[in-house]
């Protein structure tokens, strides 16, 4: 059931699932997981594409959920991305961060990014959006003030990457993203979250619950273990970027 990013649709789907007394609910992304969790505390819920289950109040602890919810997290390797940034742009001083102010998972990633950025003497300037219509204005507000832009795994930004790239490409401003899909959309680089892999992890977890081998309340949140570094070929060319020889990577068009 696809809610088409509509909260009322989500609630209707949750009502339908609980009314049908399904054996397990799979939920993709935080809003879906939260709506399903609000609808039932009995039916097991396995979620994916949720950055921090604990921050989203879906579990008591990521290590030991203590609720009917578990799943796979799309928390990106932020420190590894920062290492990549300073390797490619050693003289960078100011980083712009764009994210949705209404997405709690984005706020958590930005909090971590700001803490980690201090280790690299990077100053962070934030530009928040409330919906996709704000993206170009937010991006424009960073032009001339930052050396590059970071976007976390954020549903609002991810749904309108071309609007962001329209501004950054013209300004020759690199964009480092939280997930690989944005690189395909024109962002410069990412140490990529693989949502297909996260789906497989969540599917395996769901199977174990349905087979009676595990219970969500004692099943720790799981994470992607291996990441690929991906660059957008057109962005690299537009920026005149030289990728260091020791950076193992893939180019996408």
Regions found by a protein language model. Name each.
Residues 1-253:
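Short hydrophobic alpha-helices and adjacent helix-cap/hinge residues
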